[in-house]
């Protein structure tokens, strides 16, 4: 676990930097179009465990900035909620392994109701990645420890970047503000390295 904590700055760099064009988030290489963000009138975040907690943090950022409803559902309960989901709903599905059974079942339900699914996963070729409409691959590398560290950090970064791109696309912020959001995110890496460097203290 300690090893994986020390790997967090590199994992964040590997996840963030390839998706910056200048100082703005750009998902062209991921095949995630801006139209996806323009066409939704609500967001449903679906996940389990630590990934769900990343979703809770994202809701606190997204809802006030985007001014659309954001709901976080634990995947195992999503099927029993009779969810109000349609083609105007963006389903953001989070799973480190991409194989979480409850999350996969919830994603399948959301898609059957018409919602496009954007997954945030760490394992290429996983079932959730294959079955979702769009994929944001994090680059945390293998995570062996039971307690999630670097996978959680890159999930938060992915959600932050998605929120920033959505806000820019929907006119909720301008390029200067979006650029500042990204500078703030990159500053987290520097702060993290400073703290890790003091770990022997």
Kindly give the residue locations of the regions a language model identified.
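Cofactor-/ligand-binding subdomain signature composed of acidic, glycine-rich
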Residues: 1-40, 161-199
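Short gly/ser/thr-rich secondary-structure transition/capping motifs
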Residues: 24-29, 71-77, 117-118, 197-200
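Glycine-rich phosphate-binding loops that contact phosphosugars or nucleotide phosphates
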Residues: 38-187
């Amino acid at each position: 676990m300690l090893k994986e904590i020390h790997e967090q700055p590199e994992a964040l760099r590997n996840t963030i930097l390839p998706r910056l064009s200048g100082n703005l988030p750009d998902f062209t290489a991921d095949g995630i179009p801006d139209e996806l963000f323009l066409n939704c009138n609500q967001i449903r975040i679906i996940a389990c465990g630590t990934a769900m907690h990343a979703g809770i943090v994202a809701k606190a950022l997204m809802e006030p900035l985007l001014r659309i409803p954001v709901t976080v559902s634990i995947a195992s309960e999503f099927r029993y909620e009779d969810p109000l989901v349609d083609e105007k709903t963006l389903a953001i599905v989070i799973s480190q392994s991409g194989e979480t059974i409850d999350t996969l079942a919830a994603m399948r339900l959301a898609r059957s109701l018409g919602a496009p699914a954007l997954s945030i996963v760490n394992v290429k070729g996983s079932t959730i990645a294959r079955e979702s409409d769009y994929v944001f691959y994090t680059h945390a590398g293998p995570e062996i420890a039971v307690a999630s560290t670097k996978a959680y950090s890159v999930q938060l970064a992915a959600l932050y970047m998605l929120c920033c791109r959505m806000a820019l696309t929907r006119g909720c912020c301008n390029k200067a503000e979006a650029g500042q959001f990204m500078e703030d995110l990159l500053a987290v890496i520097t702060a993290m390295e400073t703290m890790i460097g003091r770990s022997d203290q």
